[in-house]
């Protein structure tokens, strides 16, 4: 068997079109002490990870007090009663069958981990020594210096593990005669140490208990900038070179409300997840995985991933079936739905009649009624014979949590559930958000849409705290078992793993609080998609024999770059694809102050010549009344270096033209 080889050194230097001094740039990495095996109970057996190797080992130290979780009161911050009560109820109901608790997931081994990573990032050809093809060159040309270093590190680990596997191992004397030590005695109950165990040492005390009573509380009213223009790993590398972490800032997150973050709107506007076409959106997860790996490398953390077990159960029904199977059945009724209809019905029932119910989500419903309702839904849901007005809110909330727990694949996915759980290991709050942001982008579309619907509902519950007595922290602790204890892993937990439960609750709390930020596509990722599309477009022109076209376009781009502002057109021609026969082209003056909202305003005035919108109107989408129904119009960027992108009303047309001179602008009626 031939030995797998890496790229030759000469070709490795071409991994990215960046002025690198070496094939694998040396990026400084933080040394962060972590609790080993902290989240092993989530289904991954102890093993190697994708993170950097040979890190210096440090003795365990408590997380600093300024990294404590956000709470609304000191007494509440120490309370995890909602979590333990929920776990106890799950145990009493015995929802998870014993035979279902087998080998659901296992952690990937070294070598296999890197091979899977390269495959998920679209760089699997590099591991086989096949050289750089067009797809690899296009992707690698978009990467930053820290991202290139992450790719090089995975290739190096893969090559070393492949060489070790091919060599015949030297037999150890213990392999022949065996060895016996008292440490190998199995526990009496035959269960390995995959539990939430109590931490008694003072070094591992809860950060809340070690926090100073007079900690920084002024952060509650602060609004910090969350920069998405540059890669998160590049930001972390800069902070590390500046003796990160610095005193104060987001690292000093004490008790009280979570600080607020603001995404600065650049000249190109903000891009939400739903703004990009499906073709462009498919390019985001590989880029996000490379960036997340690079960020964890800089922070000195291990990015743990698991292999998902194969689903052998039924693919029909409502409870205990995969999300994609649910959506396939739903599409027969509503072809455009993106969230399971059952979940929508449960959330709608709770929003109408349960938001003001005291203890909603925490107080259990009647188990007899819940079981009967589940059976009725399985039988009559699609026939529309379920009367939701008669469903008790507590029964509906119980059924909601049961629906999540019964998913054969966790909502946060088996592959990335350990990564979600390890987010609290990051000391800096802003960097935790960066990691969470990338993890959300890695979720499959059905999981991401379902999670978004759930988080929107949880935010509404927390907003009614005065009536339902459920704070954001209460809501988070109650929902942890349904999100972090997936099917196939019964909750054999002891009432001592408070820190571990707090960490999971913190993740849920952050996802609810910052969901608008998390469902934004970072500007640097959109820029990488543009570069990737541009590279693929130029290569396809050459492959199709359009050499003259490609050379002509190259010269045009070069001339435009040389002429600068003189080549910029004075008028923007915008196509109109809305259902309005009176207009098919709109001309708008193109100057540095022209924004998308001005285009929509001008378009509305053309449709209704006598109407003038009120000054100071906050509606940038120019709602128009037509046939007594409000009509919303949107502007899209189509073609060029982007497939399709819905434009932010505050985006500037001149900057959009410079970013994508070969694209077009189109006005369409909103699909909703």
Swiss-Prot record:
Q: Which SMART domains match?
A: RhoGAP
Q: Which residues form the Rho-GAP domain?
A: 321-519
Q: Which domain of life is it from?
A: Eukaryota
* UniProt xrefs under InterPro entries: Rho_GTPase_activation_prot, RhoGAP_dom
Biased composition regions of type Polar residues, renumbered to the chain: 47-59
Q: Which Pfam families match?
A: RhoGAP (PF00620), Ubiquitin_RHG40_C (PF25442)
Q: Name one GO biological process term.
A: signal transduction
Query: Which GO molecular function, any one, fits this protein according to its record?
Result: GTPase activator activity
Give the residue spans that cross the bilayer: none
Region Disordered: which residues? 43-68
Keyword list (alphabetical) reads:
GTPase activation
Site described as Arginine finger, located at 362
UniProt function note: GTPase activator for the Rho-type GTPases by converting them to an inactive GDP-bound state.
Protein name as annotated: Rho GTPase-activating protein 40
Mind giving the lineage of the organism this protein is from?
Answer: Eukaryota, Metazoa, Chordata, Craniata, Vertebrata
